Regions:
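An acidic, low-aromatic, low-complexity terminal/linker signal
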Residues: 1-163
């Protein structure tokens, strides 16, 4: 649950996967890195793009494009890695937890958009007939010219076989 859904203002780190804009609660973001060299992780879940070395530590790279049904894509010059906080780094406000343990996880996105402030009640629930996203999308924000799909990073980390 994001702060905006719970009645407090929140901010989202927004980015693009393909031509669609997504956002995650900025409280879950540790940092953003340029698209690094990714070492494949053979035998891992298909949404695991691979591993990267970030300042001497290993980061597992997830590909939200695969999880969202876009399929695999080439990483480009604008590709960025959104590094999520580990459970130990997360503030305990709003009950935010991620199943990272001590492992660092990053999401490879096509490009970063901006930080978007969300007023209380500014996130609409998904319509009933589009809730089949496996819980990856928790709601939408309607802007004048586009929508931001709000991702649940905890759901993204629950990699299940057969997806």
């Amino acid at each position: 649950m994001t702060a905006a859904a719970s009645g407090a203002e929140s901010r989202l780190c927004t980015f693009y996967v393909g031509d669609e804009r997504y956002g995650i609660d900025i409280l879950t973001v540790r940092e953003i890195q340029r698209g690094p060299v990714v070492t494949p992780a053979r035998g891992a879940h298909r949404a695991v793009r691979g591993l990267v070395n970030l300042r001497g530590g290993v980061v597992t790279v997830l590909d939200p494009a695969v999880q969202l049904g876009y399929g695999e894509r080439e990483l480009g010059a604008k590709t960025r890695l959104v590094i999520l906080k580990t459970n130990a780094e997360l503030p305990r406000v709003h009950g935010t937890t991620l199943e990272t343990g001590d492992d660092r996880v990053g999401l490879c996105v096509d490009r970063i958009a901006d930080v978007h402030s969300v007023e209380p009640g500014g996130i609409d629930p998904l319509p009933l007939h589009v809730r089949g996203s496996g819980g990856l999308i928790s709601g939408v924000i309607q802007l004048q010219d586009e929508m931001i799909r709000v991702m649940d990073p905890a759901a993204m980390l629950r990699l299940e076989e057969g997806e």
